[in-house]
Amino acid sequence: MSLRSAEVVICGAGIAGISTAWQLAVKHGMRNVVLADPWPPMTLTSDKSTEAYRNWWPGPDDAMVRLMNRSIDLLEDMAETSNDRFLMNRRGYVYTTADPIRAKKMQAEGVLASSYGAGPLRIHTGGAGGPDYLPAPSEGWRGQPDGADLILEESLLRKTFPYLSPATLAVLHARRCGWFSGQQLGMLMLEEARAAGVEVIEGRVEWIETTGGKVSSTQIGTRSEVISVSAPRFVVTAGPMLTSVGALLGIELPVFSELHLKIAVEDHLGVVPRDAPFLIWEDPQHLGWSDEEREFVAELSDGELLLGEMPPGVHTRIEGGGGSRYLLILLSLIHI
């Protein structure tokens, strides 16, 4: 067993662990930061993210809006200083519905999100003196409005989003939203953290020593040895392994994992244009299986999830640059 010392041990080298190490070492000058993970950085769940962001949160209070406004400020600063290495865009989130009741709820939620600090709600009904609508660019984030545009005027809706279902009655385009390359962001922060002295150990945290109710050391098992790191601070950024790490401290954490399904499909018909924003369908729906497909799906172990009513909130965005024709489709079905 080899012995080392550090100011802090961070357990988990996903985006949360890397950003923690980056903040401590790069922004706050902390030295002797250890980042431990049995897998290479950004390879468990962080590289499988939607990679999207939004400040549009209609409750239950203003906590998420304040958190995300600050987070987006930080992202913009990093994009500026790195020449947008992680390709952050400001295409926005477009919430859509064919339900008039849901359309009214979207307006009420928009008023609420605006009151929490997400920016003004601009309502487009086609009346004289109404607000102007500024389409979002496909790249970049500078010079874009915040808040949201609620489009109820049919002609503007069809002109701006001709690819949406003809049944669509309302569109809420939240503006301080978009996506970026999470992998590139993680690698950028990791490079800067390492340059500031952060040590990455590819190993599993196997034991956490406490003295007087305080962390005193951490044992990390690598392929070749066990490393004991004397450190008074231990940060858990273990993602889906959170309960396992908690058990090392004798703590049963009341958390669960939620299965988010991400499907990549080739849009060979070009249904969704490559400059489209992040699209969310707010209504429940059924998938239009043929009789043959329905019979096949019914034989799958969880086939009933796909044959019944799909929950609201299924969303999609384009994936890849250049000549890519792929879409990402994301939905949440069950807890595991």
Please describe what each predicted stretch is.
Residues 16, 41, 241:
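Conserved Rossmann-like nucleotide-cofactor binding loop
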Residues 165, 172-233:
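Helical element adjacent to the flavin cofactor pocket in flavoenzyme catalytic cores
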Residues 22-26, 38, 49-55, 83-92, ...:
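Active-site substrate-recognition segment that forms the wall
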Residues 45-47:
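Conserved catalytic-core motifs of eukaryotic protein kinase domains, centered on the activation segment
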Residues 6-34:
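N-terminal Rossmann-like FAD-binding beta1-loop-alpha1 element of flavoenzymes
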Residues 51-155, 311-314:
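Dinucleotide-binding Rossmann-like beta1-alpha1 core, especially the glycine-rich loop
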Residues 1-5:
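A short, basic/flexible loop-to-alpha-helix module at the beginning of a structural domain
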